[in-house]
Amino acid sequence: MKADRDFSALSQKEGMHKAFLSFIADSGVILRDNSYPVRGKNELAAIYAGRPDTAFTLTWDPVFERIGSGGDLGYTFGYYKSFVKATGETGSGTYITIWARQPDGSWKFVLDTGTDGLPAASK
């Protein structure tokens, strides 16, 4: 799905915060380890406020996509990589994103989650 590739490209180019705020639906949800669900664009913006994301990069590669027969919902899953610039620490894992077509025809995610600890080489 082009939206997911564009999402990752924006994260790499302009930072994770900008990418997530650009691609989350207004009522989208993010599930992360050891955290309550982040519900909606406004809550995500409040979490990101005053927290720079220039110290690390997050990118991902979708390996599968499916759009439902109605053309308004779809999902992607794949592998992600993170890199902490100061320490050189890397991470990788898997993710799934559920997408909804918006009234303007664009795709925004309504649910995003991932798990860590899976080396990219074990695809």
Predicted regions and their residues:
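A solvent-exposed, acidic/Ser-Thr-rich amphipathic alpha-helical stretch
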Residues: G15-G68, F77, T87
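A short, structured loop/turn motif at beta-sheet edges
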Residues: E65-D72, K85-G88, A100-S106
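Short, low-complexity N-terminal intrinsically disordered segments enriched in polar/charged residues
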Residues: M1-S22, A121-K123
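Residue-level hotspots at or immediately adjacent to binding/recognition sites across diverse folds
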Residues: P52, S82, I96, A120
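A short acidic/glycine-rich loop-to-helix N-cap element
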Residues: A86-T90, P119-K123
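Alpha-helical solenoid scaffolds in eukaryotic macromolecular assemblies
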Residues: D6, R66-G68, G117-L118
